[in-house]
C-alpha cells in the first residue's frame, strides 16, 4: 500500500516542507491554479532543500492522484462532515492521510506535523478532531484502502464515463492505475542518442527517445542540458512530428507550437519551420528552448485559428490546445480543475483551428492533427467532423513499420492513439491522439 517516505525528518525542515505542501495544495484546490504554475509561484518552496522541495511536491501530487480514496477514508473516520468554512482543516487532513496511507510516513511523524500545521487561533478547537481522525486512520487505514475501489474513487465522472464508453471498463481501470504512478523522464536527442543513453544511463526506446527513471531531480542539472544535446519530450509526444515523414528541406508550419518540443524535432530533422503561437510568453519560452538547443525556426505570435500563412506549406502540424487528460500522470490536478464544459469549449476551438490549418496545406501536402487528450470528443470525433466537411482531405493511415514497438497504439482507422497503460511495465506513455491527413 505504501511508497517509501522521502522525508522522514519530522523536525523543523519536515515542518517547513509540509507548510509548503499545504500552501501548494490550497493554491491548486482552492484557488484552482494549475499544479505546475502553483509550483513555480509558491514562495515557501524556494527556501527548502532539494530533498524537502521534492517531498513537498510528491506529497501534494499524491493527494491529487488519490483524492477520491483519501476523502472516502477521511469521511469514514469523521463523525460529521467538515464545514465548508473549514477548508484549511480539510487540506491538512488530506496531507496527513496521504502520508499515512500512501507514503509510508511513520504515524507519529504524520500526526505530529499535521498538528503543527494547525497551530494558531484559526484552528482553535480543531486540533483535537485532527488528532483523533488521523490516529484512527493510522489504525484502520490499511483495511480501509484494501476495501476501496481505487480506480473509480480517483477518477471523476467527466473522465470515467467517456473512457468506459470509448475503451471499455477494463481499460478505464488500467488508465486509472497508470495515473497513480510517477512517470519516467523521456528525452529527445538532437543527435547521437547512443552516446547520451550511455552518459545518462538511459534506455533507448523503439522510436529513438531516451527514457530515464522517475525522480531525476532538476532536469537542468543533467548532463547535456547546458550544451543543448536534448530536450524533455514524452515518447508519445514525439510521434506526431514523425508522422510527417522526411521533412528535410521542406517548409513545415507548426501551429500552437509552444513550448517547442515538436518545433525542435522538425528543425533538427532539417525542416524550415514556421512556429505559430498565440501566447507571447509561451513563444518567448519556445525561442529560449531553441536557442539552448542551437536550433532555428521562424516564429510568429498569432492566433492559429485566424493567422494566414504567407504561402501553402508542404506539411502542417497542429498540436491543438486540449483538456490534456492524457497527461494526468504528470499533471494530476487536471482531473479536479477541468470538466465537461472545458472539453466542449476546447472541441469548438479545435474545429476552428483545424478549419484554418487546412487552408495552409498545399495540394499533395500533409496535415497532422494531435492532442494530448484521452477524450474522443477532442480526437477522433474532431477528425470525423473535419472529413465530413472537406472532400479535399483523405486520411493517410499509419503503417506498423512507422511506429516500432507501438503497433498497439494504431487504431483500426490507422490513427495513433497511445494510452498511459501502454508499455506499462516499461513506464507507460502519455495519452496522445494523432491523425495524418493528405490534401488532394
Region spans (language model):
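S-adenosylmethionine
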Residues: 1-440
Amino acid at each position: 500500500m505504501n511508497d517509501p517516505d522521502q522525508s522522514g525528518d519530522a523536525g523543523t525542515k519536515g515542518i517547513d516542507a509540509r507548510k509548503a505542501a499545504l500552501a501548494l495544495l490550497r493554491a491548486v484546490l482552492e484557488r484552482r491554479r494549475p499544479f505546475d504554475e502553483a509550483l513555480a509561484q509558491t514562495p515557501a518552496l524556494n527556501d527548502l532543500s532539494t530533498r524537502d522541495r521534492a517531498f513537498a511536491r510528491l506529497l501534494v501530487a499524491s493527494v491529487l492522484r488519490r483524492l477520491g480514496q483519501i476523502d472516502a477514508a477521511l469521511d469514514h473516520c469523521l463523525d460529521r462532515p467538515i464545514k465548508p468554512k473549514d477548508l484549511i482543516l480539510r487540506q491538512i487532513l488530506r496531507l496527513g492521510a496521504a502520508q499515512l496511507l500512501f507514503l509510508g510516513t511513520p504515524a507519529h511523524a504524520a500526526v505530529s506535523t499535521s498538528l503543527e500545521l494547525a497551530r494558531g487561533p484559526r484552528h482553535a478547537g480543531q486540533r483535537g478532531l485532527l488528532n483523533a481522525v488521523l490516529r484512527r486512520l493510522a489504525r484502520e487505514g490499511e483495511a480501509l484502502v484494501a476495501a476501496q475501489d481505487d480506480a473509480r474513487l480517483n477518477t471523476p465522472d467527466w473522465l470515467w464515463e467517456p473512457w468506459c464508453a470509448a475503451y471499455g471498463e477494463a481499460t478505464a481501470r488500467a488508465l486509472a492505475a497508470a495515473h497513480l504512478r510517477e512517470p519516467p523522464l523521456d528525452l529527445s536527442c538532437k543527435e547521437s542518442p547512443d552516446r547520451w543513453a550511455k552518459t545518462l544511463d538511459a534506455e533507448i526506446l523503439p522510436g529513438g527517445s531516451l527514457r530515464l527513471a522517475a525522480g531525476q531531480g532538476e532536469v537542468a542539472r543533467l548532463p547535456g542540458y547546458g550544451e543543448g544535446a536534448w530536450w524533455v519530450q514524452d515518447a508519445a509526444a514525439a510521434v506526431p512530428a514523425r508522422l510527417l515523414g522526411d521533412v528535410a528541406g521542406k517548409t513545415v508550419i507548426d501551429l500552437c507550437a509552444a513550448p517547442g518540443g515538436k518545433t525542435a524535432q522538425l528543425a533538427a530533422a532539417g525542416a524550415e519551420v514556421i512556429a505559430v503561437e498565440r501566447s507571447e510568453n509561451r513563444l518567448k519560452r519556445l525561442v529560449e528552448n531553441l536557442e539552448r538547443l542551437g536550433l532555428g525556426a521562424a516564429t510568429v505570435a498569432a492566433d492559429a485559428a485566424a493567422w494566414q500563412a504567407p504561402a501553402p506549406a508542404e506539411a502542417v502540424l497542429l498540436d491543438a490546445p486540449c483538456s490534456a487528460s492524457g497527461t494526468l500522470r504528470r499533471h494530476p490536478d487536471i482531473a479536479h480543475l477541468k470538466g465537461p464544459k472545458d472539453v466542449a469549449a476546447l472541441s469548438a476551438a479545435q474545429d476552428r483551428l483545424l478549419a484554418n490549418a487546412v487552408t495552409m496545406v498545399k495540394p499533395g501536402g500533409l496535415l497532422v492533427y494531435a492532442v494530448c487528450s484521452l477524450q474522443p470528443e477532442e480526437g477522433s470525433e474532431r477528425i470525423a467532423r473535419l472529413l465530413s466537411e472537406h472532400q479535399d482531405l483523405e486520411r493517410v493511415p499509419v503503417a506498423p513499420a512507422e511506429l516500432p514497438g507501438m503497433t498497439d497504439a494504431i487504431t483500426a482507422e490507422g490513427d495513433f492513439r497511445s494510452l498511459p497503460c501502454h508499455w506499462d511495465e516499461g513506464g507507460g506513455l502519455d495519452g496522445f491522439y494523432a491523425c495524418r491527413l493528405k490534401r488532394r
